[in-house]
Every structure is written in C-alpha cells, then in structure tokens.
UniProtKB/Swiss-Prot annotation:
<dbReference type="GO" id="GO:0006357">
    <property type="term" value="P:regulation of transcription by RNA polymerase II"/>
</dbReference>
<dbReference type="GO" id="GO:0005634">
    <property type="term" value="C:nucleus"/>
</dbReference>
<keyword id="KW-0805">Transcription regulation</keyword>
<dbReference type="GO" id="GO:0043565">
    <property type="term" value="F:sequence-specific DNA binding"/>
</dbReference>
<feature type="region of interest" description="Leucine-zipper">
    <location>
        <begin position="79"/>
        <end position="93"/>
    </location>
</feature>
<dbReference type="GO" id="GO:0003700">
    <property type="term" value="F:DNA-binding transcription factor activity"/>
</dbReference>
<dbReference type="InterPro" id="IPR008917">
    <property type="entry name" value="TF_DNA-bd_sf"/>
</dbReference>
<keyword id="KW-0238">DNA-binding</keyword>
<dbReference type="InterPro" id="IPR004826">
    <property type="entry name" value="bZIP_Maf"/>
</dbReference>
<feature type="region of interest" description="Basic motif">
    <location>
        <begin position="51"/>
        <end position="76"/>
    </location>
</feature>
<comment type="function">
    <text>Since they lack a putative transactivation domain, the small Mafs behave as transcriptional repressors when they dimerize among themselves. However, they act as transcriptional activators by dimerizing with other (usually larger) basic-zipper proteins and recruiting them to specific DNA-binding sites. Small Maf proteins heterodimerize with Fos and may act as competitive repressors of the NF-E2 transcription factor.</text>
</comment>
<dbReference type="GO" id="GO:0000976">
    <property type="term" value="F:transcription cis-regulatory region binding"/>
</dbReference>
<comment type="subunit">
    <text>Homodimer or heterodimer.</text>
</comment>
<feature type="region of interest" description="Disordered">
    <location>
        <begin position="1"/>
        <end position="21"/>
    </location>
</feature>
<dbReference type="InterPro" id="IPR004827">
    <property type="entry name" value="bZIP"/>
</dbReference>
<dbReference type="GO" id="GO:0000981">
    <property type="term" value="F:DNA-binding transcription factor activity, RNA polymerase II-specific"/>
</dbReference>
<dbReference type="InterPro" id="IPR046347">
    <property type="entry name" value="bZIP_sf"/>
</dbReference>
Length: 156
C-alpha cells in the first residue's frame, strides 16, 4: 500500500497495483456505513483493514471535536448575550430603585410635616409664627403639586 508522505484533507487511500480495491477519500471513508466499510474491506490484508479502520476512527473523532468546538462557541456567545441582557436589566432596576427611594423620601418628608402640623392643630389655637406659617404653606403647595386628585375635604 502506498500513501502520500504529506497527508492532506483529501488523502486518497491507494492500493498496490495488483489489487482490485477501490480508492477511498476521507469523506467517503467517514460517511459510509459500517456495512459498506466492511464490504470495501473484504479481500484486504489485516494490516490494511486495521489502517483503514484507524484512519476512519481518527477522521470521525476529528469531526466530533470540530462539532464540539462549534457548539461550545455557540453556547459561549449565547451566554454572553444573556449576560449583557441581564446586566442591562440590573442597571435599569437599580435606576428604578433609586428613583423610588427618592420618591419614598419625599413622601416621608410630607408625612412628617403633616404629622407635625396635625399635632400643632390638635393642641389648640396658637399664635402664628413665621416657622409654622412656612411649614403650612409648604405642605399646602406640595400637596397641590403632587396630587391631581381631589384634595382633603372637610365634607365627608
């Protein structure tokens, strides 16, 4: 059996001139079924059979490895895309959280101002001071700005 000393992708398995066995390319060797391979191996020496089977196994393993590499790269790209998407979602939620904290702080301040005002009203008539008047005005203005619904009414 003679082969090319420099193997290439389309290496042909050549038989000695006296034999009738057909020439098999790498693609043919890999793609044929076991039954077809066994038919081609009939009449070959044990050494040639072993060499062809080893070559077929090597080529198939090479194909499996290439397939695995492609799958791994594809999965890596998909995971990277998901990571970027989730990172953007985390950033968006952090912005929403920050905004809601600011809103909560503003509502807490209004609530505390209303409580203070309610305590001063509950104590009875007081002489208006500049601080108390400012507090009431602030409360009234902030209530008008923040609420488009009906403000507090006396008639219930």
């Amino acid at each position: 059996m003679t082969t090319n000393p420099k193997p290439n992708k389309a290496l042909k398995v050549k038989e000695e001139s006296g034999e009738n066995a057909p020439v098999l390319s790498d693609d043919e060797l890999v793609s044929m079924s076991v039954r077809e391979l066994n038919q081609h191996l009939r009449g070959l020496t044990k050494e040639e059979v072993i060499r062809l089977k080893q070559r077929r196994r090597t080529l198939k393993n090479r194909g499996y490895a290439a397939s695995c590499r492609i799958k791994r790269v594809t999965q890596k790209e998909e995971l990277e895309r998901q990571r970027v998407e989730l990172q953007q979602e985390v950033e968006k939620l952090a912005r929403e959280n920050s905004s809601m904290k600011l809103e909560l702080d503003a509502l807490r301040s209004k609530y505390e101002a209303l409580q203070t005002f309610a305590r001063t009203v509950a104590r009875g008539p007081i002489t208006p001071t500049k601080v108390a008047t400012t507090s009431v005005i602030t409360i009234v203005k902030s209530a008008e700005i923040s609420s488009s619904s009906v403000p507090f009414s006396a008639a219930s």
